[in-house]
Amino acid sequence: ACYFSSIDVYSIYNNAILKSKKNTISNIVGLSLGLSLQFIIAHNKYNPIYLSIPIIITTFIPFLVRFISFHKMKIVKQTTVNKKIKYNRYILSSGLSIVFSSLSIAIYTRINQFMISYLDGEYSLGIYSVAIILSSSWAFVLTSLISSTLPSIFGEKDDNRAIKIGIKLNIIIIVISLFVLSFILLFGEFFINLLFGEKYIPAYSLLKILCISTMFANLGTLSARFIIRSSGYSFLSKKMFIMVLLSIPISYYLIKSYGLIGAAYSVLIIEFLSLTLMNYFFKNKIIWKLHIATLKMNFK
């Protein structure tokens, strides 16, 4: 599943040419098939190893759809060797910081799982994993929205105009997240029982908290794009390294003291710090300005 996600450059291409609708549709198809298979496997009590199939399908189907769609298009001109070398150098120099930042994110989001397994046992880890899966299953909608607006944000030379676009997107992210949270509050317990069984009902209390964490994470993604827009690659990599270091004591203390609820709250705290305080040290305080303007709903 991770392999298909990592080689899926076609989603980036669709976002760049303002056709993120293709990404959204293919993601919905993949997610629907994945969840349907999960339900069939859980309902019929098949060997849990079969749950790896829907996980793979969730990323493979969108990749396959985008791959076929891309190769049906007529790609125009070939670039010269010199331009390719120059472009590859630029990708390498600017991309290494982003790679390090992404690795840091992957590490600090997994720290909780290691600590739950160590401090609370495998059953608790299973409950937490279910909550994580469901709380992030809808995030592709927000990711598509963010990606589709990136060209307009990166293409805008004036910071104030870029911030106005960011304000609107922040509000859309918050509204969609609150709608999903309301749905989870009403039907979350029912769907956990339907998809995973009665033993995983305790995941419901975690799901509500982790859903808010998902909102913060996506608001943080938008803020990170503003930082990249200002060439803050080095800042991002340093920030995420600090977040990894911070997440270890926070996760350990909360999990040891409060168990699974503590684990969920540790994610919430880390995502909130990453979104707010840690971003406010960036030059010109552009993220601070973005957040204050969002709270005031200042579109002027």
What does each model-identified segment do?
Residues Y3-I25, G155, I212-K239:
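Membrane-interface junctions at transmembrane-helix termini in multi-pass inner-membrane proteins
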Residues A16, S135-N160, F226-R229:
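Helix-loop junctions and terminal segments of transmembrane helices
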Residues K21, P48-I55, L64-T109, G155-K164, ...:
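Interhelical loop/hinge segments that connect adjacent transmembrane helices in multipass membrane
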Residues T24-M73, I132, I242, L260-K283:
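Hydrophobic alpha-helical transmembrane segments
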Residues A42, L103-S137, I192-E198:
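Helix-terminus/linker motif at the lipid-water interface of multi-pass membrane proteins
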Residues P48-I49, I53, K86-I98, I116-S136, ...:
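Interfacial/gating helices of multi-pass transporter permease domains
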Residues F60, S97, N112-F114, S124-L142, ...:
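Alpha-helical transmembrane segments of polytopic membrane transporters and translocases
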Residues E122-S124, L186-M215, I261:
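Interfacial segments at transmembrane-helix termini and the short loops linking adjacent helices
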